């Protein structure tokens, strides 16, 4: 399962690279990637815990983007 979470985290990273790191909601990200919502949420948690992802509350959803080094 850890490997699967890691691959999904890579898919999320690639998604942001391909979309110029434009902020996206969790709902849109889950709809865009061919992964289960649970796996997407676990991968987002991994990236956020590692300090690679910035999450902000957006109504009933969350908006996120990659943290880029300054």
Predicted features by range, described:
Residues 5-27, 31:
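Short amphipathic alpha-helical interface segments
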Residues 2-9, 57-70:
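Short, cationic-aromatic polyanion-contact patches
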Residues 27, 41, 58-59:
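Short loop/turn and capping residues at structural boundaries
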Residues 35-46:
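Short amphipathic alpha-helical interaction segments
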Residues 24, 38, 55-56:
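A local structural micro-motif
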Residues 34, 48, 65-66:
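Short secondary-structure boundary/hinge segments and terminal tails
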Residues 48-58:
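A short, conserved structural fragment
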């Amino acid at each position: 399962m850890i490997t699967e979470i890691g691959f999904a985290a890579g898919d999320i990273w690639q998604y942001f690279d391909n979309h110029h790191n434009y902020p996206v909601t969790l709902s849109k990200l889950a709809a865009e990637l061919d992964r289960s919502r649970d796996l997407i949420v676990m991968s987002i948690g991994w990236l956020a815990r590692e300090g690679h992802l910035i999450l902000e509350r957006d109504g009933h959803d969350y908006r996120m983007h990659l943290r880029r080094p300054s």
